[in-house]
Swiss-Prot record:
PROSITE patterns per UniProt: INTEGRASE
Gene3D superfamilies given in the database record: Ribonuclease H-like superfamily/Ribonuclease H
NCBIfam families (alphabetical): transpos_IS481 (NF033577)
InterPro entries documented for this protein: Homeodomain-like_sf, Integrase_cat-core, IS481-like_transpos, RNaseH-like_sf, RNaseH_sf
Pfam families: HTH_32, rve
Protein name (record): Uncharacterized protein YagA
Induction (UniProt): Expression is repressed by the transcriptional regulator XynR.
GO cellular component, one term: cytosol
Gene (name only): yagA
Organism name: Escherichia coli (strain K12)
Domain Integrase catalytic: 137-303
Length: 384
C-alpha cells in the first residue's frame, strides 16, 4: 500500500506521538497503523518500545536528561510553573500540573500547585464562560465527527476561515485548517486529507449553513458526496449551537490560546500556529472532560479506510430507476420534475406508494424526496 503520510522534519514528533498513542490502545492493529503512518512495522515497534521504556523522551531523536527529582524546592517548582505558564498561559493549575507530570516531572499536590500559581500571578483570569449542561458523547471514536467553520477573521494575506473537525467521543482534533473561503470544493479537499489519515466516520454533523447545509432543507452537493462514501449526515438544530457543544468549546479554546490579541503576517505563519496548537491540544493538553487525559489517548483511527472510489447505487427489483439530467430534472411517465442541481447525473430509485401516482424518491439507502404525479410536483428535502 502506498504511504499516505510520510514523516518529515516539520511534524515528526507529533506524528510519532500520535502513532504510539493509537498503537498502545487495546485491540489496535499495529500493522494497519504503520501503513496509515507510512512507516515499516519495524520502525513502528521500535517507537512503541522506546515509548514504553522512556515515555515521551524516547520519541526524541536525541535522548533528553530526565526531569525526575523527588526533592525539589518550592523555588524549583515555581520555576517549572513559570516555564509551563509561559508556554500555555491560558491553562489553569490542574492542566499545568498534569502536563508537567506527563513531561516526567514529579509535582506536589494540586492544592500546592494552585497556591503557588496564585501567589505568583500565573492563573488565567476568570471568564464568564457558558453555563454547564448535561454532557453527551458517543461510546467509541469515529461514531460521530462534528464539523464547522470558526468565524472568519483578518490576517496579513486577507481573511482566514478556520475549518475545524472534532471526534465526539475523544475530543480529538482531526482538522484545524486555514481556508481562504467556505466553498464546497475547499471543504472536500481538506476532508480528503483527513479521510486518508484517519479513515471514515459513521456519521458527521454540521450546522445548517453553506456549504454543508441549506436552510430550506434542500440537499447539497457536499451532503451527497459524504453520503456516497457511506457517511450519514446530520445537522444541528437552527439557533441551537449547543448541539455542537464540544466543537463550540474547542473554538473558545482556540480563540483564547491562539487567536486573541495576535496578528499573523501570512498564511504560512497562521497554519504553523494552527498545527502547533493542534498538536498541543491533542497530545499534551489535559482535558477535564476526559479525567485529565489527552484526546490522543482516547482516539483510534477508523477501520473504514478511504479509497476515493464509490460504487453506483443499486436498487431492489421493481424499483423504477431514473437518471437526473444535467439541468437537475428527471422524467416520470411523461412528467418533467426538478430534483435539484445536487442530483445532476445521479440515478435515483422511485418506490411506488399506496396512494396512486405517488412515489418515494431514494438515493442509495436514503429517502430524499416524494413525487405526486397528480399534482405534477416533487418535494426534495430532508423532511420528506
Amino acid at each position: 500500500m502506498e504511504s499516505l503520510m510520510p514523516w518529515d522534519a516539520r511534524d515528526t514528533m507529533s506524528l510519532r506521538t500520535e502513532f504510539v498513542l493509537f498503537a498502545s490502545q487495546d485491540g489496535a492493529n499495529i500493522r494497519s497503523l504503520c501503513r496509515r503512518f507510512g512507516i515499516s512495522p519495524a520502525t513502528g515497534y521500535k517507537w512503541l518500545q522506546r515509548w514504553a521504556q522512556e515515555g515521551a523522551a524516547g520519541l526524541q531523536d536525541r535522548p533528553r536528561i530526565p526531569h525526575h527529582s523527588p526533592n525539589r524546592s518550592s523555588d524549583d517548582i515555581t520555576a517549572l510553573l513559570r516555564m509551563a505558564h509561559d508556554r500555555h498561559e491560558r491553562w489553569g493549575a490542574r492542566k499545568i500540573k498534569r502536563w508537567l507530570e506527563d513531561q516526567g516531572h514529579t509535582m506536589p499536590a494540586f492544592s500546592t500547585v494552585h497556591n503557588l500559581m496564585a501567589r505568583h500571578g500565573l492563573l488565567p483570569g476568570a471568564s464568564p464562560g457558558i453555563p454547564a449542561t448535561g454532557r453527551f458523547e458517543h461510546d467509541a471514536p469515529n461514531r460521530l465527527w462534528q464539523m464547522d467553520f470558526k468565524g472568519h477573521f483578518p490576517f496579513g494575506g486577507g481573511r482566514c476561515h478556520p475549518l475545524t473537525l472534532l471526534d465526539d467521543h475523544s475530543r480529538f482534533s482531526l482538522c484545524l485548517a486555514h481556508c481562504t473561503d467556505e466553498r464546497r470544493e475547499t471543504v472536500q479537499q481538506q476532508l480528503v486529507s483527513v479521510f486518508e489519515r484517519y479513515g471514515l466516520p459513521d456519521r458527521m454533523t454540521m450546522d445548517n449553513g453553506s456549504p454543508w447545509g441549506d436552510t430550506t432543507g434542500t440537499w447539497t452537493a457536499l451532503e451527497l458526496w459524504l453520503m456516497r462514501l457511506g457517511i450519514r449526515v446530520g445537522h444541528s438544530r437552527p439557533y441551537h449551537p449547543q448541539t455542537q457543544g464540544k466543537l463550540e468549546r474547542f473554538h473558545r479554546s482556540l480563540k483564547a490560546e491562539v487567536l486573541q490579541g495576535k496578528w499573523f503576517a501570512d498564511s504560512g505563519e497562521l497554519q504553523r500556529a494552527f498545527d502547533h496548537w493542534r498538536t498541543v491540544y491533542n497530545l499534551e493538553r489535559p482535558h477535564e472532560a476526559l479525567d485529565m487525559a489527552v484526546p490522543g489517548s482516547r482516539y483510534q483511527p477508523s477501520a473504514r479506510q478511504y479509497s476515493g472510489n464509490t460504487t453506483p447505487p443499486e436498487y431492489d427489483e421493481g424499483v423504477m430507476v431514473r437518471k437526473v439530467d444535467i439541468s437537475g430534472k428527471l422524467s416520470v411517465k411523461g412528467v418533467s420534475l426538478s430534483a435539484g442541481k445536487a442530483f445532476r447525473g445521479e440515478r435515483v430509485g422511485l418506490k411506488e406508494m399506496q396512494e396512486d401516482g405517488s412515489y418515494e424518491v431514494w438515493w442509495y439507502s436514503t429517502k430524499v424526496g416524494v413525487i405526486d404525479l397528480k399534482k405534477k410536483s416533487i418535494t426534495m428535502g430532508k423532511g420528506c
